[in-house]
Amino acid sequence: MTSTNEIRRSFLEYFGSNGHDVVPSAPLVPYNDPTLMFTNAGMVPFKNVFTGLETRAVPRATSSQKCVRAGGKHNDLDNVGYTARHHTFFEMLGNFSFGDYFKEQAITHAWTLLTREWGLPKDKLLATVYHTDDEAFELWKKIAGLPEDRIIRIATKDNFWAMGDDGPCGPCSEIFFDHGDHIWGGPPGSPDEDGDRFIEIWNLVFMQFEQTAGEITGSLPKPSIDTGMGLERIAAVLQGEHDNYDTDTFKALIAASESLTSVRAEGDHKASHRVIADHLRSTSFLLADGVLPSNEGRGYVLRRIMRRAMRHAHLLGAKDPLMHRLVPALVAEMGAAYPELGRAQPLIEETLLREEVQFRRTLSNGIKLLDEATATLGEGDKLPGDTAFKLYDTYGFPYDLTEDALRARGIAVDREGFDAAMAQQKAAARAAWKGSGQAADSEVWFDIAERVGATEFTGYTATTGEAQVVALVKDGKEVDSAMAGDDVAVIVNQTPFYGESGGQTGDAGTITGGDGLVLAVSDTAKPLGRLHAHNAKVQSGSVKVGDVVRLDIDVARRDAIRANHSATHLLHAALRHRLGAHVTQKGSLVAADRLRFDFSHPTALSAEDIAAIEAEVNAEIRANEVVTTRLMSPEDAIEAGAMALFGEKYGDEVRVLSMGRVADKHYSVELCGGTHVRALGDIGVFRIVSESAVSSGVRRIEALTGEGARQWFVAREDALKNTASILRTTPEDVEARVTALMDERKKLERELAEAKKALALGGGSAKAENADEDVNGVKFSGQVLEGLDPKDLRGLLDQAKQRLGSGVAVIVAVNEGKASIAAAVTDDLAGKVSAVDLVRAGVEALGGKGGGGRPDMAQGGGPEGSRAADAIAAARAVLTA
């Protein structure tokens, strides 16, 4: 067993055969912790289980979790490519016990897998324990037979884990592999522990204590186990390598970049190939999990990683964009373990190509400035912070990219100066991730949830029902009662009201009770994802905790929401059929009056695309197939072809919605907890009313169904009828009538233009000649023409020159308050009088500037058409100067 894929499979099979639920990797965007930028450890998906907010049917689990560390306090980006073990993307192998087995079995599993299953030499392994954890110390002696000098007590926080200042915590035991005395370094806890001889390969966390404000306050009633082993590290050990980048997966990716660049991964180029291989993994997996490059939050970190890799591609001399051409090699290596890579491959390649083309322009300008700024700097010098900031602010060069670019030359960057320059601006591109967090009153919901548990939702089959009030929240605090006029959130033990989630708006309706109680529910929220909070105003009577009440949803509103929600599923399927499998949902709004659907696609949809998609959805609606619902495990549902939305929280049992038919398969199959129509015909009709961009690579469709669509059609039919009445024709003939009117208008415009030209000639040569005068021995013709198109001025001046024989002609055309002036000089006067001088004098009189042309023909204009006569006079005055 040598390949990384075999090691991953072996790990999961071992723990699966030992009673652990094999759990697929969660997405890189955490669904249960908005304070985290990315999933950065194997235990993140199980955080709520460890804290008691969730329970699992099987108390043991194992996974190979995708992780990214490139933002926040867990940021390995700067070191990637220059060390043997730093990565932005890695896989964390882990086994977990939720109140089941504890230290002895955890150590037994670890030792058995490493030495018996994988055959690692026992004399190459040693363990650390927290300095007061005598139990773990003795277990290592008993189970592994390790001598005491290879069980090292560590007193630092490295061997004690805590989930913040409050909550579960406990000691750790780390397993190290000794690469041999030919490599410098000492064992953990020694002065030389930072060397590379002894490498941590597995961390066992024993969650056994409860702490408050950083102080241990007692023992957990059900101690738990959380372990983590970096797949890349153990692959290096099992493949006989000391460097993670020498393992099979990285070798394949580096070989691909060597082939495409014709540059070997040696010497100064070694780090660049490693950076590209690592960053290819993180960027591709982030894109596959729905993160798109942007200038803030997760998207900004993704763009930083992309650009760092692309700069190293530039260092390798790549003449054309490189990153997108490496994606097939990554899919070949990891696509079997992570099918989402293959599904998203077109989107990954197109996004990488677009970003690299854009960044190559940025890079060219930035590198030029950087070279100029460092021309006089040598090893040990510092680049001024304001220069680094200019690179960032003007050329899009992140600070770490500048720092990385200067690393090889031994030039540092003045970070304090950079920060000072940054503070002077309100730029937020590099703002630290703060997460969305919970509302300010989130603690009250935690208190209620712990006391009463989750609200039971009955709304899939019912629109009314009775329930008991279990909590009331007013102004962010729990209250015992509420009176008429109060705004209050009502929590009951069971409800038919759908709480806003998954893009679907919450239900509205009424809550009634004894003694004339009436509450008008405006919407229903879903705090913590478990409670249903009915936001209501007490219209009459009073409500108190413990009351039995009746709940009635607004059925007409619910029906409209259901139609719109089912239509989004059909729309999603139609988009994928028409545009490709790269289309994934990026967001949605399902309201009573409309639906909005955001999806991944790089370009605007054509009119043909929109028409085809709309027609396909309506065909499914007319077929009126029954919508089927099945409850399944998430794994079975996905295996059966259901589309799961990454980032959505799915429980042990999910609802699988199947709609329509294509051949012998359902048209749409998705995991969804929302409310839907019983048959597709209930949607009525589907109409797309707009398609637009949301952000780079994300498009938005807004649409109407049912009554909303009917009203939309009626409004347009009324507009057509009114237009027909105005045009004195029938609705059927409006197009022909408008076409005829437009043709007639064009004809009249041509006739008008000819008439204006004729008028410009004074209605005949006699009138034009009457406008001629002698000015300082030069024949001068000056005319002001209302409504003349400026483009006709030259033709009129040519005619005037022919009439004059020898002389100067000036014409001012006035249109909508503005004026255009043009002047012409006959050839015999070209050396004496300049048309440019005449025009500039006239332009100044018209309140304008400039004017130009040739000595024999010039033109200009100004905003003050009322001064047209003054412009003629100013031009005439030039001849007397």
From Swiss-Prot:
GO CC annotation, single: cytosol
EC number: 6.1.1.7
Coiled coil: none
Protein name as catalogued: Alanine--tRNA ligase
Domain statement: Consists of three domains; the N-terminal catalytic domain, the editing domain and the C-terminal C-Ala domain. The editing domain removes incorrectly charged amino acids, while the C-Ala domain, along with tRNA(Ala), serves as a bridge to cooperatively bring together the editing and aminoacylation centers thus stimulating deacylation of misacylated tRNAs.
Residue numbers binding Zn(2+): 565, 569, 672, 676
Organism: Novosphingobium aromaticivorans (strain ATCC 700278 / DSM 12444 / CCUG 56034 / CIP 105152 / NBRC 16084 / F199)
Primary subcellular site in the record, as a coarse category: cytoplasm
